[in-house]
Amino acid sequence: MNYRVLHLADLERFLELRMEFLLSYQNVPKDFRNITENYLRKHMETEDLLLLAAEEEGSLVAACMVCFYETCPMVDNPSGKYGELRNVYTKPAYRRKGISEKLVGMALEKAKERGVTKMRLHYTDDGLPLYQKIGFVPEERYMEKDL
């Protein structure tokens, strides 16, 4: 298994895996793949997005992404630098082999290298045990509103 950072040359293979992930638990609008592709083309080679993958024999079998952003310093995060872990997904045939755990570990290390001091994520029920094992704790006082 080869673990690595993805680049624009990997875009199509990453998009296939991301769409497989999203479709595994929700309906996805018809144009969502194009919207995602446009976003990735704009951000993949910048400092505000990192894509990691596990690859076996030329096929992506797992991947995740981290979106980076900075806010005003907070008491619990004086740097104000955050990473948001997104779309950790492993193909079903490769699950329960520690692949996602290794990818998340890589994401955390890469985030630290960028000065990030707090990582956030939204989790599925399937992913909760992994994130708790790694040391993530649920944050109860979080809200959002569609605009």
Regions found by a protein language model. Name each.
Residues 2-16:
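A short beta-loop-alpha structural element at the N-terminal edge
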Residues 87-90, 96-109, 113, 133-134:
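Conserved acetyl-CoA-binding loop-helix of GNAT-fold acetyltransferases
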Residues 76-92, 141-144:
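Conserved acetyl-CoA binding element of GNAT-fold acetyltransferases
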Residues 19-40:
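Conserved GNAT-fold acetyl-CoA-binding loop/helix
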Residues 101, 113, 117, 125-145:
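Conserved active-site alpha-helix within GNAT-family acetyltransferase domains
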Residues 41-53:
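A short helix-loop-beta-strand connector motif used in the catalytic cores of GNAT acetyltransferases and
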Residues 53, 59-68, 84, 89:
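Conserved beta-strand in the GNAT
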Residues 85, 118-121:
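Conserved hydrophobic beta-strand within the GNAT/NAT acetyltransferase core sheet
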